[in-house]
Amino acid sequence: MKKYRKILAMLAVLAIVLVLSGCSNTPITDKSTGFWDGLIILNFSRAIIWLSNLFGHSYGLGIIVFTLIIRIIILPLMIFQTRNMVAMQEVQPQMKALQKKYSSRDMETQQKLQAEMKKLYAKHGVHPMASMLPLLVQLPILIALYQAIWRTQALKTGSFLWLQLGSKDPYYVLPILAAIFTFASSWLAMKSQPEQNGMTTSMTYLMPVIILITAINVPSALSLYWVISNAFQVGQTLLLQNPFKINREREAKKQAERDRKRTLEKARKRAIRNHKR
């Protein structure tokens, strides 16, 4: 399981690098070519501008609506990923028991461990890699959305509320909101896990700082995207991975197991007393 966590962490870092690397790319125009620029990002850019015109040439609303549309489109992938992750968390105690049982490092024992793990995964309908496939599909979409907003020059000429979309937020409202929503979504997801590791905890506190510093120094169009996307992520986490509900259910299961063991122990003692009579 640690191996898969490391892979997920590496993917997260890769996503950050790819997203931030988009800051130095050239503007997207009708003359942009190639699969990534000419097909993906250009059409994302056109969709945002079309929506902006639909809402009275408001580029701010265009960014908001298109961001929400993209997040809703990839929501089924998130549902699948979250359910698989929750199922993986639930089988953790059984996985640890198997690892303890087959703790020897010789090849034969490790083969038995792998066979038992496969049976456990099949029984509960989960697989570690199943959580990564949706992530690999989502990342290019979200990166394309990010770059479409960053590299579409027309979006930087508009205004929205107190913002000039091509300039930094003068009051730092959007950077602060983006950081708050980033922390909230990460914290909620972390609290839903039965065990928190150091990597998860570090990223929960590190990512909001990165988002805050970056959002302070980029045009408001990009900060607006981060606010909407991360606010959606908070709602999504509360819907799919609500830690308060999950922890209540987890505690109820533990209490039921304690009650079952207590009942069995009482029955055992009663049987011993009756036998002595």
Curated annotation (Swiss-Prot):
Cellular localisation: Cell membrane
Transmembrane segments: 35-55, 60-80, 130-150, 170-190, 208-228
Lipidation (S-diacylglycerol cysteine): C23
Annotated Basic and acidic residues bias: 251-266
Lipidation (N-palmitoyl cysteine): C23
Residue ranges, annotated region (Disordered): 251-277
UniProt membrane topology term: Multi-pass membrane protein
CDD domains tied to this protein: 5TM_YidC_Alb3 (cd20070)
Alphabetically ordered keywords of this record: Cell membrane, Chaperone, Lipoprotein, Membrane, Palmitate, Protein transport, Signal, Transmembrane, Transmembrane helix, Transport
NCBIfam families cross-referenced by the UniProt entry: yidC_oxa1_cterm
Family that this chain belongs to: Belongs to the OXA1/ALB3/YidC family. Type 2 subfamily.
Role summary: Required for the insertion and/or proper folding and/or complex formation of integral membrane proteins into the membrane. Involved in integration of membrane proteins that insert both dependently and independently of the Sec translocase complex, as well as at least some lipoproteins.
Protein known as: Membrane protein insertase YidC 2
